[in-house]
């Protein structure tokens, strides 16, 4: 897929080195087609890393995408250069009159706080509500998935005794859904979280379908509104060394952390990770773009309701 990204976004050069086809705005404007408009609300601390991880996975269909990045007015990022935020991110207030074919809302390092204590809770729930009438399909990832399920359906989260950390085996509960087209019977997903949601709470809500889960890591994906919303508790977008970085960071800080499970070759942190999730991560995002965004969105984007 040719990705239409803001000129000079750092991810452009990083992904070109991986032989991924990206174009900047100036080249895209010469192509006489309507690109799909995708907005990413990036709540992760290391924003450039997350941008690159997501854009990498959005690059595997023949569709042209126009990627925009949203930020919160009520929260200031402390780990990303101000110049980068000014150059590539826009406040929700400046974007709220736009319509988008797809939206991705990332995780955030606030999962151990009560939702209402998060300093941007009011703003982000406003965005959740806005997305229902301004976006064709939205992916909620990790904390955003928990927060969305709580906001819309009252599904609570629960603290874990030990961090869910590693690569876990999953299975599909609902066969035949386009989001899983091409998936194997079992597939692997990275998880890195201190809280969980319980399948029993999902099953109580008639508007939700629990479509994939793990015997080890629990709920993985719930779907609502016929695919206009997906709530995903894992991190299929993670690059090979993300868990390694988290593990060694916490070790260096003296924090209690177990080695990520099913991750390093021979369970030896001196060895490289064994990537078991790349294929299904690519399928997940390409299936979402094709079947739930491109196939469902109106040509006249203003008709999104």
Swiss-Prot record:
Marked site positions, Important for acyl-CoA specificity: 111
Keywords: Acyltransferase, Amino-acid biosynthesis, Cytoplasm, Methionine biosynthesis, Transferase
Functional pathway: Amino-acid biosynthesis; L-methionine biosynthesis via de novo pathway; O-acetyl-L-homoserine from L-homoserine: step 1/1
Matches recorded under Pfam families: HTS
Protein purpose: Transfers an acetyl group from acetyl-CoA to L-homoserine, forming acetyl-L-homoserine.
Family as reported in the entry's similarity comment: Belongs to the MetA family.
The name this protein goes by in its record: Homoserine O-acetyltransferase
Organism: Phocaeicola vulgatus (strain ATCC 8482 / DSM 1447 / JCM 5826 / CCUG 4940 / NBRC 14291 / NCTC 11154) (Bacteroides vulgatus)
Gene behind the chain: metAA
């Amino acid at each position: 897929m040719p990705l239409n990204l803001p000129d000079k976004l750092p991810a452009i050069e990083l992904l070109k080195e991986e032989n991924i086809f990206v174009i900047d705005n100036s080249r895209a404007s010469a192509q006489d087609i309507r690109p799909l408009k995708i907005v990413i609300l990036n709540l992760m601390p290391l924003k450039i890393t997350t941008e690159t991880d997501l854009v990498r996975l959005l690059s595997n269909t023949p569709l042209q995408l126009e990627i925009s990045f949203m930020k919160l007015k009520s929260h200031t990022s402390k780990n990303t250069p101000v110049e980068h935020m000014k150059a590539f991110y826009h406040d929700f207030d400046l974007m709220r009159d736009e319509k988008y074919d797809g939206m991705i809302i990332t995780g955030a390092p606030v999962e151990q706080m009560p939702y209402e204590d998060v300093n941007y809770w009011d703003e982000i729930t406003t965005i959740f509500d806005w997305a229902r009438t301004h976006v064709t399909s939205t992916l909620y990832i990790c904390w955003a998935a928990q927060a969305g399920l709580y906001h819309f359906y009252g599904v609570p989260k629960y603290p874990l005794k030990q961090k869910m950390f590693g690569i876990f085996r999953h299975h599909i509960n609902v066969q035949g859904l386009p989001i899983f087209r091409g998936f194997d019977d079992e597939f692997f997903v990275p998880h890195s979280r201190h809280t969980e949601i319980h399948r029993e709470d999902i099953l109580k809500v008639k508007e939700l379908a629990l479509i994939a889960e793990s015997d080890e890591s629990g709920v993985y994906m719930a779907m609502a509104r016929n695919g206009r919303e997906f709530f995903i508790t894992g991190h299929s977008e993670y690059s090979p060394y993300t868990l390694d970085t988290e593990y060694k960071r916490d070790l260096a800080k003296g924090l209690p952390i177990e080695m990520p499970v099913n991750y390093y070759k021979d369970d030896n942190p001196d060895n490289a990770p064994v990537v078991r999730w790349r294929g299904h991560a690519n399928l997940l995002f390409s299936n979402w773009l094709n079947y739930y965004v491109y196939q469902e969105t109106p040509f006249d984007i203003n008709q999104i309701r």
